[in-house]
Amino acid sequence: MIKTYDSNEYDVIVVGAGHAGCEAALASAHMGQKTLLVTIGLDMVAFMPCNPSVGGPAKGTVVREIDALGGQMGKNIDATYIQMRMLNTGKGPAVRALRAQADKWQYHEYMKDTIENTPNLTLRQAIVDELVVEDGVCKGVITNTGAKYHAKSVVLTTGTAARGKIIIGELMYSSGPNNTTPSIKLSENLEKLGFKLRRFKTGTPPRVNGNTIDYSKTEEEPGDKVPRHFSYESKDENYLQNQISCWMTYTNPVTHEVIRDNLDRAPMFTGVIKGVGPRYCPSIEDKVVRFADKDRHQIFLEPEGKTTKEVYVGDFSTSMPEEVQLKMVHSVAGLEHAEMMRPGYAIEYDVVEPWQLKHTLETKNVKHLFTAGQMNGTSGYEEAAGQGLIAGINAALSAQGKSGFTLGRNDAYIGVLIDDLVTKGTNEPYRLLTSRAEYRLILRHDNADLRLTEYGHKLGLISDDRYQAFEEKKQAIKDTQARLHEITVHVTDEVQDFLKSIGQEPMKAGVKADVFLRRPHVTINDIERLTGQKIDGDRYVKEQVEIGIKYAGYIKKEETRIARLKRQEAKKIPADIDYNMIEGLATEARQKFEKIRPETLAQAERISGVNPADLAILSVYIQNGRYSRVNK
């Protein structure tokens, strides 16, 4: 038995320095709270144990939202990327997504340096074994060395280290990601405190030596020449021009035969793996079995950094035995002679059932305790970072005795993510998708600053200088809209020729420039050229104005739906309501309401298994004052 001793006191303690923990700790420190960030290993701060990239559909928007609120992830990737690409450029603005290939080692070093040089923030290596909980309130943590740290709020971000178990074929051993030390006792402590845990599984592919790849047999995927950024503070002139390409290749029938011949040794199919894996990131053996009609699957070869030869074999996640992995790799075009530097593996880990959380990410049964990241059942660095930021903000507010901060489904993808977790729970690693957002034309990649910067400034995470620049951008958008309404586009041969070139009907009479801009494929730059009028030099201002005008009708429809949502969100459900007193509720609805304890009628409406009749009964029960009579 290790003897405990009283160590330092803090306002906020964050356990785990992955992508969630880093955002949580930085937010707390920036809000003026004395913060301790504890990690199992200092070499794993903001480490990328799987894909060395940031962003993509929905996820890229989350990174922009983190930046707009004053978080770090966007700045960190802008300082350390080796390639940047905008995805879905041929589609509408609601689904466009920025994705960056990271130098994973630089990413870790840059984040660690940021943390080490942030006032109010202490970084320490230790394993947290136990929470200090008194009368249902979390008041600190105890480490494996016996140090007892006291705090007003605690944030847990254990990632995949919680009772982590790595599986490679027949080999199984206790481990955190990338062969790090796992966290065992903390999970046991959470169970003793009454938390419901479950097992999830994720996996990672082999890494191969880039010097042994025959790139002539693969297809190049270069970065964009047009400057792109995740952070609104990054400058176009700093955009990296000499980017490192990724490469694309495919599996083939030989690969699939190797996999099928060894399914009797595949932990995914032998029953060895008990945890539920991610639906949207299946292992290659799972894909071959589930999609037996496909004769090939796409693979991306992604460099892990500028100073390493390790290449990540994307979309090739596997837990097959090592010698089988070698055969699989060598069957792929371009990888016939590739040297495998690290085998792929599966990892099982504990997660907290997220219905046990409030929208602030505070736990319902232990006050002043917050959880964030993969331990809440999500997958992905970006989802983790978004949760970490919200948990860190609320831990800091809680430490100051202030009310919590939440984002709605109409505010941000982060709001969609947290609401899905809290009201619906998840039976598998949750991945954020654009299809999960009802208001995705409002929640775009390009307008995260317009949606969220004001919140960040009020919280103390956005500086006055940055907020002033934001206000100037908003004014420039208004000025540009007004300018377009003043300018007339006249019928000229040049205008008619231009319209013909983009497949548009010719003009019959002159129109205001904002009306002309509604036409597909017309830009403000085109209007400037055709009219000789200078409108605005900032491409980001032009982008906002163009989208606002072209999609005005659709945006108005979404705003109408959001107004209805807000009316429902305003209808609060008393916290101590007894659902057993409500006559007529379906049994499933009664059980779900009792378990999840929704705070508003809008949240109750989103719980799976609840039908409109149940909502009507609940609404009438509250509105008619029956609740108040019962509780007198």
Curated annotation (Swiss-Prot):
Pfam families: GIDA (PF01134), GIDA_C_1st (PF21680), SAM_GIDA_C (PF13932). It is found in: Cytoplasm. GO terms for biological process: tRNA methylation; tRNA wobble uridine modification. NAD(+) binds at residues 277-291. GO terms for molecular function: flavin adenine dinucleotide binding. Disulfide bonds: none annotated. Its main location: cytoplasm. Residues 216-225 have a biased composition (Basic and acidic residues). Residues 206-225 are annotated as: Disordered. Gene3D superfamilies: FAD/NAD(P)-binding domain (3.50.50.60), GidA associated domain, C-terminal subdomain (1.10.150.570), tRNA uridine 5-carboxymethylaminomethyl modification enzyme MnmG/GidA (1.10.10.1800). It comes from the Bacteria. FAD binds at G16, A17, G18, H19, A20, G21, V128, S183, Q374. Transmembrane segments: none annotated. GO terms for cellular component: cytosol. Keywords: Cytoplasm, FAD, Flavoprotein, NAD, tRNA processing. The keyword RNA-binding does not apply. Homodimer. Heterotetramer of two MnmE and two MnmG subunits. Belongs to the MnmG family. This is tRNA uridine 5-carboxymethylaminomethyl modification enzyme MnmG.
